[in-house]
Amino acid sequence: MNLEALPKYYSPKSPKLSDDAPATGTGCLTITDVMAAQGMVQSKAPLGLALFLAKVGVQDPQFAIEGLLNYAMALDNPTLNKLSEEIRLQIIPYLVSFAFADYSRSAASKARCEHCSGTGFYNVLREVVKHYRRGESVIKEEWVKELCQHCHGKGEASTACRGCKGKGIVLDEKRTRFHGVPVYKICGRCNGNRFSRLPTTLARRHVQKLVPDLTDYQWYKGYADVIGKLVTKCWQEEAYAEAQLRKVTR
């Protein structure tokens, strides 16, 4: 049994709760078996299971973020160690939240639109015609609200890759013309990941507000390195939790 099969047991749509295809045998897992297996996995891999359940929206992410925060505080990073305790306690929780947000992204997830800051509109300076009672009309420049063209007023946008639309593959036009049949290749924009990752420049802007004299070396060797380690830790813990679940349910 894989971790991806767990969320359906939290919102069943039919009385047939099984991880296997319908069969006459008794080897299929019931919801009681799955919940018992989850309890055993939680005792052996609590962080990995919490990360996955928080990623799919089943569980509150607070416990998972606290586990990542403890891991980040234990990291021996020279750049972070040079900071004062006050600044360090402000930066590390933000890096942890940023890494968790990057880990939680998928082709089906949505994120706040960065172009309108989640409002669905943005203010632009336009020429507006003003009409008066005397029949005169005057053109003035005013700030007006316009619908955001990226999210179409929703305030959130899909994180799926714009090149492949979340498929991971795109049509190879050159080889398609050569062979006369559709030929596909891995999307060069997302490298087959099907979604775009969070740009670390967003985290750098926040860090630079607290550390004004931030250099490129300090960013890449310190803060960006911590983000990379945190994201890697998330995937390692999830893989370990899945291995434990397979071991329990085999």
UniProtKB/Swiss-Prot annotation:
Classification via SUPFAM superfamilies: DnaJ/Hsp40 cysteine-rich domain (SSF57938)
One function term, GO molecular function aspect: DNA binding
GO biological process: transcription antitermination
InterPro entries in alphabetical order: Antitermination_sf, Antitermntn, HSP_DnaJ_Cys-rich_dom_sf
Keyword Protein transport: no
Annotated signal sequence range: none
Tagged with keyword Transcription regulation: yes
Keywords: DNA-binding, Transcription, Transcription antitermination, Transcription regulation
Pfam family, one: Antiterm
The protein's role, per its UniProt record: Positively regulate expression of some phage genes. Bacterial host RNA polymerase modified by antitermination proteins transcribes through termination sites that otherwise prevent expression of the regulated genes.
HAMAP family recorded: Antitermination_lambda
Family the entry assigns: Belongs to the phage antitermination Q type 2 family.
The protein's name in its UniProt record: Prophage antitermination protein Q homolog QuuQ
Organism this protein belongs to: Escherichia coli (strain K12)
Species classification: Bacteria, Pseudomonadati, Pseudomonadota, Gammaproteobacteria, Enterobacterales
